Regions:
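Hydrophobic ligand-binding cavity/cleft-lining segments
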Residues: 1-46
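Short, surface-exposed coil-to-beta transition loops
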Residues: 5-7, 64-68, 87-91, 103
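Beta-strand/loop substructures that line and gate deep hydrophobic ligand-binding cavities in soluble
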Residues: 79-133, 138
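Helix-adjacent hinge/juxtasegments
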Residues: 57-74, 80
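A short, structured loop/turn motif at beta-sheet edges
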Residues: 16-17, 47, 73-77, 93-103, ...
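Short, highly charged C-terminal tails/helix-capping segments
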Residues: 36-39, 140-145
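Hydrophobic pocket/interface hotspot
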Residues: 19-23, 29, 54-56, 71, ...
Length: 145
């Protein structure tokens, strides 16, 4: 089902813990969003864990909306993924490299349903660009001194 996933990776000159702490903090998500759709965290914990639910104020094509997400995968400093009503998942995987930083892979996984809709709406290509932007922003934030 890899054809229903979009993934991009980047190497960040920071330990996995620092990077993971950013990703696991919904309040930081607007700083890390390459799509320009994430506005602010409105509900949920300050730091995510398996099963956490968190709400985000969003805006797409000028229209505001609220999205509730639930963490469905969690391995401290290694993997975190969440899904929402659309059933697709956003997943981050972190791999510390020997003295070379941390490889971060972000995946938009739409194998869980509505694949035809996602493909027809252009979501895979649009989300690939957004992931690339998000990873650049994550790198910038994580590498700050």
């Amino acid at each position: 089902m890899a054809e229903h996933m979009v993934a991009r990776s980047i190497v960040i000159d920071a330990p996995a813990k620092r990077i993971f702490d950013l990703i696991a903090s919904p309040g930081k998500h607007p700083l890390l969003d390459g799509s320009g759709t994430v506005l602010k965290a409105v509900s949920g914990p300050e730091r995510l864990e398996l099963g956490s639910e968190f709400g985000m104020d969003m805006r797409m094509m000028g229209l505001p909306y609220r999205m509730t997400n639930r963490v469905v995968e969690f391995e401290e400093n290694r993997v975190i993924a969440w899904k929402h009503v659309g059933s697709h998942r956003w997943r981050y995987e972190l791999e510390e490299l020997d003295g070379e930083g941390t490889r971060v892979t972000q995946t938009f996984d739409y194998t869980w349903g509505h694949t035809f809709f996602y493909m027809m709406s252009g979501a895979p290509a649009r989300n690939a660009r957004s992931i690339e932007g998000s990873l650049r922003l994550l790198k910038r934030e994580a590498e700050r001194d």
